[in-house]
A protein has these predicted regions:
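Membrane-interfacial, low-structure loops and terminal tails that flank and connect transmembrane helices
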Residues: 11, 16-46, 104-110, 319-321, ...
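TM-adjacent membrane-interface loops and short helices in multi-pass inner/ER membrane proteins
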Residues: 216, 407-455, 470-474
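Transmembrane alpha-helix boundary signature
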Residues: 96-108, 126-139
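Membrane-interface catalytic loops of GT-C/OST-like multi-pass glycosylation enzymes that act
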Residues: 72-78, 139-144, 217-218, 262-269, ...
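Interfacial loop-to-helix junctions that mark the boundaries of transmembrane helices
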Residues: 74-83, 109-112, 143-144, 323-332
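Long, low-complexity, polar/charged, intrinsically disordered or flexibly structured peripheral segments
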Residues: 352-395
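Alpha-helical transmembrane segments of multi-pass inner-membrane proteins
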Residues: 18, 24-26, 30, 43-44, ...
Length: 550
């Protein structure tokens, strides 16, 4: 009663306040305070997160589906969209972050080294172009594949914008759905159907070269390789049966789409993604069984797609590593073996056996992967240096490093290394300028027979491309950024579906990075997936657990 009288005196009331009226006043004050707090959170703290989600949706959902009526304009069309929209989002993000500075302690960024290396890479790109006086060809990339300075800065800005937010589970579902739509459209095109009129203005015989809204079949397959692990992560690590079935269905469609591209990089990348998901699935036998089933489905995708392509009206040709494995029936054999291992994991789990720990499983499998890689490199060195006369047949295209290695990639790699060796010290350090590779390599095109498919405006190796255009500084930042992102995601992934999927995606990107060109859709997707993983880490750190289960 003493406290009540004090409150009444403060309000200068003459009539005593009842207990019920006092409680009503307290509740009303608390409700108003809560409403004000929520409104402030939406207007200030949540605004950067909203812009981050919009940017991620644009880069990973809208951009792959953007399409122009002429196939040869796909690159330029997507690049122009990025260069128009991302700067506006960056301006909004900067304004929102200034408004959100309330003096409260911010959540520290888990990937600080990754962000610094990205910044260093962008600085290296600017320096390389500054040495040319910011020539227009270096800004818009018109002499290459349109990965000029402006586009690279926009992709870097998108990386920082997406990484500043907190990825939600619904966004992940939307990304997977959009990637599945791209894969379905590519499968329809590969089977000889053209529902959207893609081939109306294309030359006869080139229908098998372009698939879906991505364009060239090589980039179509490698794009799906980067998105396949996000769906696979849902199947392997999700605790909800519905999400597991959703993830498996989408992953199977994307695996078939990747095999429809008929490329070595898509085939290798798909299996690298499955291997990475299996390597980090330790600690739970059912989870390991899911990873083995996913890998088995990926193995079955090659023979299934090869049979389906036989009925296509366009009659696409299968060559290289996919044809070799199809003729050997390796996909069917590996599928049966993996399904048997998955059944063994389920049987052991029902008998109460424990799975090996996550760290031990990852250490053993990644060690085996490292030994297999060293063995492959040693075999290549042996047949390239020691036993150069042995007839290897079709295997020579990837076991003997010469001008014909990797569908003429060896020719571009060797000339790129010669050009770098002949460059001056300043150019070696800072590069010749973005997308000026053709100028650098043209004096070294000494074998006209190797140019029957066209000249090389890219050495078909992204680190080599960065070495020629951005110098040692740019290449070192690019490679270290990849390594830092991979280590960060592996260290924090645990059994979070999105983080594990992002790790597998970055791990599979290694083959894309080594044997593919620096293509706009690949760079944009790669940087965005890396940022998606970092934003998921921020969300995990703020909530203290897995946050990517819708």
């Amino acid at each position: 009663m003493v406290g009540m009288k004090a409150i009444v005196r403060m309000k200068k009331r003459t009539v005593p306040m009842s207990m019920s009226e006092l409680l009503y006043k307290i509740k009303s004050f608390g409700a108003r305070r809560k409403l004000f707090s929520a409104r402030s959170c939406f207007e200030k703290k949540r605004l950067p997160e909203l812009i981050s989600l919009i940017c991620a949706a644009f880069m990973l959902c809208a951009l792959p589906l953007l399409f122009h009526n002429a196939f040869f304009d796909i690159n330029r069309f997507k690049v122009e969209a990025v260069c128009r929209i991302v700067p506006a989002l960056a301006l909004l993000m900067g304004t929102a972050m200034l408004l959100a500075r309330t003096g409260e302690k911010r959540i520290p960024h888990p990937g600080r080294a990754t962000r610094l290396l990205m910044l260093l890479f962008l600085v290296a790109c600017v320096i390389a172009c500054a040495r040319t006086g910011f020539e227009s060809a270096t800004l818009d990339g018109s002499e290459g594949r349109y990965c000029g300075l402006i586009f690279m800065l926009c992709c870097g800005a998108a990386f920082f914008i997406i990484g500043e937010g907190k990825t939600c589970a619904r966004l992940l579902v939307l990304i997977v759905i959009c990637a599945t739509a791209v894969a379905l459209l590519g499968l329809v095109n590969a089977m000889g159907f053209d529902p959207l009129g893609f081939y109306a203005r294309i030359k006869t015989g080139q229908e098998t070269v372009f698939l879906s809204t991505i364009g060239h079949f090589d980039f179509f397959g490698t794009y799906l390789v980067m998105l396949f692990p996000l769906a696979g992560g849902q199947f392997v690590f999700s605790e909800k049966r519905g999400m597991r079935m959703f993830g498996l269905s989408c992953a199977c469609v994307m695996a078939l789409g990747a095999m429809a591209s008929r490329t070595d990089s898509a085939l290798i990348g798909l299996h690298l993604a499955c291997f990475a998901l299996l390597a980090i699935s330790g600690g739970s036998l059912p989870t390991m069984a899911h990873a083995l089933v996913l890998w088995a489905m990926a193995c079955a995708a090659l023979p299934v797609m090869c049979v389906l392509l036989g009925f296509s009206t366009f009659h696409p040709q299968i060559s290289g590593l996919p044809k070799l494995l199809f003729d050997l029936h390796a996909g069917e054999a590996l599928c049966v073996l993996l399904l048997a291992l998955a059944a063994a994991c389920v049987w052991l789990a029902r008998r109460g056996r424990k799975a090996p720990g996550r760290r031990k499983t990852a250490a053993v499998l990644f060690s085996c992967f490292g030994l297999a890689t060293l063995l492959l490199l040693g075999t290549m060195v042996y047949f390239s240096v020691v036993d150069t006369g042995r007839n290897l047949g079709e295997a020579a295209s990837f076991l003997r490093f010469d001008d014909s290695w990797g569908s003429l990639r060896g020719f571009a790699w060797i000339r790129a290394m010669r050009a770098f060796a002949d460059a001056g010290p300043v150019q070696k350090l800072f590069g010749a300028g973005m997308e000026l590779t053709l100028r650098v390599l043209t004096p070294y095109f000494d074998d006209p027979s190797m140019l029957r498919g066209g000249v090389f405006n890219d050495p078909h190796c992204q680190p080599l491309q960065m070495l020629l255009t951005c110098g040692l500084l740019g290449m070192a930042a690019f490679v270290l950024f990849y390594a830092a992102t991979l280590v960060t995601l592996l260290h924090h992934a645990r059994h979070d579906p999105l983080l594990c999927g992002a790790f597998a995606s970055v791990f599979a990107y290694s083959v894309v990075m080594l044997i593919n060109v620096t293509q706009p859709i690949l760079i944009a997707t790669y940087f965005s997936v890396c940022a998606l993983g970092l934003s998921a880490l921020r969300a995990q750190r703020s909530s203290g657990g897995n946050t990517h289960e819708p």
